[in-house]
Amino acid sequence: MIHPTAIIHRNVFLANDVEIGPFCIIGSDHGPLGLGPGTIVRSHSIIEGGNVIGPGLETGHHILIRTGNEIGTNLRIGTMSRLEGGGKIGDYVRIHGDCEMTKGELRHFSRLYGGSYVTDNRLPPSHVNENAILDEGAVVTMNCVVIAGVRVGVGSFVGASTVVTRDVPDATALVNGKMKPVTELRWKDIEYPWPRNFRDYPAEAQPRLEALHKRIIDLLQ
């Protein structure tokens, strides 16, 4: 269903079951845009043309996706979040509300929590732009900044309000400026590695999720 107040550009191709909410702008003169089966775009959102987007995209309200991104299957992106151009996003990635990413890479099953920013420019600013990477199954929690050129490893975890200025190795937690194996973190009802404990993935993702879980366990050996 396409809300009558939505603006759909002439270069846009929509699957039959796509839902577009009120006051959205879909497409632009930057190039063609296709939105596949299962896509839901909520109100006041803007998705520019020239993006490659897999099926099952689901957005919050007031999101912005600029041109030049490559986005995999079943991205969920929360209210007020922004993807600037040139980003790469894998399958089953979760971006919560009020996040921003510029030319970064979020690999399969990675998660970026509210208020976090993935940058493409080191501090102090320079003419060199480098992609930051969240590897498969990586979790960056609330109000973090991942500096350009940094990699957060497979199955790794970054605690809230952290500025990540150096690589976080695979299966490692960065909390209060200190690194340790993710298995040393314990909260009620949660055991690491992370991916198996999240429940918001469709059934078809489960075999890949289990393979990632096994990979993280092997990294901890």
Residue ranges and their predicted role:
Residues 1, 7, 12-13, 19, ...:
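Glycine-rich hexapeptide-repeat left-handed beta-helix
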Residues 3, 9, 15, 36, ...:
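Residue-level recognition of the GNAT/N-acetyltransferase active site
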Residues 32, 41, 47, 64-65, ...:
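Extracellular beta-strand scaffolds
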Residues 41-42, 140:
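Extracellular beta-strand-rich, repetitive "passenger/adhesive" scaffolds
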Residues 48, 55-56, 60-67:
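Glycine/small-residue-rich loop that forms an oxyanion/phosphate-binding "nest" at active or ligand-binding sites
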